[in-house]
């Protein structure tokens, strides 16, 4: 995967992977196409993981792209879980309120693999960076709204 591509390009490659695999399976004699699709997917997922792990989300484009990853209905769940894992490693190293906010959104995802992973990561990050959260009032407000929503849904 070329470094010049953005989040939307990476997302398109990852979203198209199930279709690419289905087409390759229709042509069992064409092993080269299958290998190419697998390499493209693996390279894209790896590049997305490494750039998410190693970067702060300083600009709005990166944050918008991460929301698109979370909201994509075509993205395989394993790829979204990999992205969530990159956020865990990044937050363990350096607290980023935008990534933590993304985790709060991921905790309400429809897929249980994603939302449970996000909840566990939130607990880990709150343990590691317990003193940091109060430095971000907007993030504390979002956490409060999240806890009220989950408490209300548990009571109903």
Each language-model region and where it sits:
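Alpha-helical solenoid scaffolds in large eukaryotic transport, assembly, and signaling factors
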Residues: 5-109, 114-115, 121-135
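Eukaryote-biased recognition of long, low-complexity, charge-rich segments
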Residues: 135-156
């Amino acid at each position: 995967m070329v470094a010049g591509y953005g989040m939307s390009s990476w997302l398109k490659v990852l979203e198209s992977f199930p279709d690419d695999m289905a087409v390759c399976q229709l042509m069992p004699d064409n092993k080269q196409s299958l290998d190419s699709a697998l390499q493209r997917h693996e390279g894209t997922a790896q590049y997305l993981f490494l750039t998410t792990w190693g970067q702060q989300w300083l600009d709005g484009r990166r944050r918008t792209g991460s929301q698109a990853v979370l909201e994509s209905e075509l993205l395989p769940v394993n790829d979204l879980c990999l992205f969530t894992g990159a956020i865990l490693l990044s937050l363990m190293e350096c607290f980023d309120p935008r990534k933590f906010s993304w985790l709060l959104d991921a905790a309400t995802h429809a897929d249980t693999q994603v939302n449970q992973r996000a909840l566990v990561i939130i607990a880990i990050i709150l343990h590691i960076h317990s003193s940091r959260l109060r430095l971000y009032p907007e993030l504390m407000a979002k956490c409060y709204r999240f806890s009220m929503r989950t408490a209300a849904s548990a009571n109903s």
